[in-house]
């Protein structure tokens, strides 16, 4: 959201709650006043080799969720190549534990275990991902849109006590009518962001240099989400250490999706960067492989609802 120039994610709990009551939405990051012990706990996990402990991950995640005062919470727990949890069974175990914690704290909870073997959308990088999110709110159909509508269906049904069919219909109508895009603009404006960028993607620029990545062979395309994420980060699109400045214009745009049939030499992606880093570009190229047989994973592996 900080791709919107001036956007303030550092809201206090009071500011967050007030904005939600006023306009129906807010986006905030973790601040020093929000679960301040969590960073210390993570530091302890780091030096005791317990970073991947499922109970400690669950307590860390849920401490922040419960501090938000939300009475209905939906969790999207990723698994796969680009996720912290590689195996779907481990992701589901984590999801069930977090749902249990939330319910014991009196919250209505649900969770979806979803696949991140390859990128969810067609874009990687701050400005590029915001552009794609805006496109979805304008009606673009892709996996990002499918998963977003799935989440809307489940969360609205749980929060409002309506059927999932009605919840989905309301979500689809909000996109078709332009209400969803208008709500994003309200949130951006309320938090000090440049609302013009919601309607003008040129205000969310991509980096000045572009390298085309081509298929290394003929067959079905296989894409590593982890390799692309690391490449984007190394090119400046993410922080490699605390205090690093993020270049919001760095981007990787997919021209073909995982599982698509491709011919050797066919363009499969574009990498946008301002500072050339050979290792990062090599990582991006290496993220694309071709195989003769490709088994797509379901977008949603499992769902833990109110009855589970």
Protein language model features and the residues they cover:
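Phosphate/pyrophosphate-binding betaalpha-module
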Residues: 2-68
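Well-ordered secondary-structure scaffolds
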Residues: 50-53, 57, 64-308
């Amino acid at each position: 959201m900080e791709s919107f120039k001036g956007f303030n994610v550092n809201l206090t709990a009071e500011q967050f709650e007030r904005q939600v009551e006023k306009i129906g939405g807010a986006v905030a990051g973790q601040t020093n006043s929000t679960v301040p012990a969590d960073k210390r706990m993570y530091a302890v996990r780091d030096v005791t080799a317990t970073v991947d402990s499922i109970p400690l991950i669950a307590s860390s995640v849920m401490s922040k969720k419960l501090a938000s005062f939300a009475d209905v919470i939906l969790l999207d727990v990723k698994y796969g190549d680009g996720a912290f949890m590689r195996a779907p069974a481990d992701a589901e175990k984590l999801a069930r534990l977090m749902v249990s914690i939330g319910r014991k704290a009196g919250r209505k909870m649900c969770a979806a275990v979803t696949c991140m073997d390859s990128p969810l959308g067609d874009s990687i990088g701050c400005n590029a991902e915001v552009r794609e999110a805006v496109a979805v709110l304008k009606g673009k159909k892709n996996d990002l849109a499918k998963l977003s509508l799935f989440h809307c269906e489940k969360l609205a049904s749980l929060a409002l006590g309506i059927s999932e069919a009605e919840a989905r219909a309301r979500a689809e109508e909000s996109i078709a009518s332009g209400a969803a895009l208008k709500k994003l603009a309200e949130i951006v404006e309320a938090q000090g962001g440049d609302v013009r960028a919601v309607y003008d993607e040129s205000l969310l620029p991509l980096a000045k240099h572009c390298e085309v990545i081509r298929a290394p062979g003929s067959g079905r395309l296989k894409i590593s989400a982890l390799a692309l994420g690391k490449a984007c980060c190394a090119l400046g699109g993410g922080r490699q250490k605390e205090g690093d400045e993020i270049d919001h214009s760095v981007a990787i745009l997919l021209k073909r999706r995982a599982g698509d049939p491709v011919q050797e030499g066919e363009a499969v992606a574009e990498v946008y960067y301002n500072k050339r880093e050979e290792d990062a570009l090599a990582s991006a190229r290496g993220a694309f492989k071709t195989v003769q047989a490709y088994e797509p994973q379901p977008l949603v592996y499992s769902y833990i609802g109110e009855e589970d």
